[in-house]
Amino acid sequence: MKAKSNNYRGKVDISVSQNFITSKNTIYKLIKKTNISKNDFVIEIGPGKGHITEALCEKSYWVTAIELDRSLYGNLINKFKSKNNVTLINKDFLNWKLPKKREYKVFSNIPFYIT
């Protein structure tokens, strides 16, 4: 796992419209409906608690997960420290530069404030 930035305090921040899908059944149904494969690089916007990130790590080659909330980011660092196919970034996705040198797919349980 690669990681970039801060740490976790534990409260949901409604100003950034956090919402979490925690049902493994729902997550696997969502992932199954995508065309993500073992060869894909995936960018996940707002991984939150990492439930979807886990499934994406199983399904794809590499996941770059961008989390704005420093608290959640800290938990993600701990949760994924033994994974070797994930990069965690503590940044606002809206201010993050998308990669130009590789193809990628985007997956997100999009925070309401972005839409």
Language model segments and positions:
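Catalytic cores of RNA-modifying enzymes
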Residues: 1-115
